[in-house]
Amino acid sequence: SNTAIGNDSLDSNTTGSNNTAVGVDSLQANTTGTLNTAIGMLSLNANTTANNNTGVGQASLYNNTTGENNTSGGQASLYNNTTGGTNTAFGRASMYWNTTGSHNVGVGADALTANTTGPRNTAVGFQALRYVTTGDNNTSLGYLTGSSGTGLATGYGNTLIGAYTGTTGTTTNYANVLGMDVSGAGGYTTLGQGGSDIRAAHGNTSWSTVSDERYK
């Protein structure tokens, strides 16, 4: 059985079952999708056949059509997702532009907001990884991580921990950065704060001060 509360909620449903739609136009286009929960005006509005999605907040998962196993909480979170699956987004406009990217986690307002097709990214913090579009396998924890300075966009395999931590370029790969307001180069592990950092190349290279190991 289904539960529909609100004008035009579950309006197009045919054989879909075990759906809950609360709010005007929530799950409005759903036909055969099952086990979906939409709470908030326009939440999961375009969903047709997809299953096991949860959208809480105005227009959350608004454009989702066939993407499955997504969880979205916050106004316009995962708004443009269409076929991407197994994504988790909490916070206003988190993962807003995601369309087909899958297995991503964005927690915090505007976290991973520009991601479109990039998979397996984790961003926790206000505007964390906000400029990443197609990058993959990035992990970011902290306020504006990966978003200050140049802003990571298409790089992959980066780990950024600490407020304002980032990379030296938009396409940086395999940078490990720990500290506050410090940027790391690809292929290096960087620790510290601001300009006072130490850095070592991955592998057997010993730690060096920033003065002789700064990426140029």
Regions found by a protein language model. Give the residues of each.
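Glycine- and small/polar-enriched repetitive beta-structure motifs of secreted/surface proteins
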Residues: 1-212
